[in-house]
C-alpha cells in the first residue's frame, strides 16, 4: 500500500491553488493542494501502525508554525512544474527532517523545496506562457499550520487521509 505525509493548507489557499490546478495540473482530481513532507512510500497495514505511533510522537515535539507563500516558481529545466514557493522556515525544515529518520525511512528522493504545485506535465511552450503570466502576479499568503496528515493511495490513484496529527498536542 502506498503512503505519504503532507500538509493541507487552509481552504483559502487550496481554492487559490485549485483555480490554477484545474487548468494546469493533470493530478488535480487525485489529491487536494498540499505541501509534501514525505514522498510516496510503501508499507504494510501492520507496519503503518508502528509508523503512526512514531508520527504521533513527532507531532507532539513540534509546535504549530507559519506557512508563508513567497511567489510563483518552477523546477524547469529539470521538469515542467509550476508551484507556489513556500518559505523554508526553520520549523518546517525541522519537521521535514524529523520525518526522514532511520525509523521512518531516511531516503529523500529530492532536496526539500517546500512548495504547493499549481501546474505540471505541461508542454514546454504552454509552460513558459503560463509561467510568464503568473510571474507578473503577486502571491503572498500566510497562515498557521497546526497539523500534518498520513495519506494513503486508493486503487484508482486518489489519495485520502489515513490519520491526522496535531502539532504540539498530547492525545
Language model region names:
Residues 70-78, 117, 147-158:
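Short proline/glycine- and acidic-rich turn/helix-capping motifs at secondary-structure junctions
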Residues 1-66, 74, 88-142, 159-171:
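Basic, often amphipathic N-terminal segments
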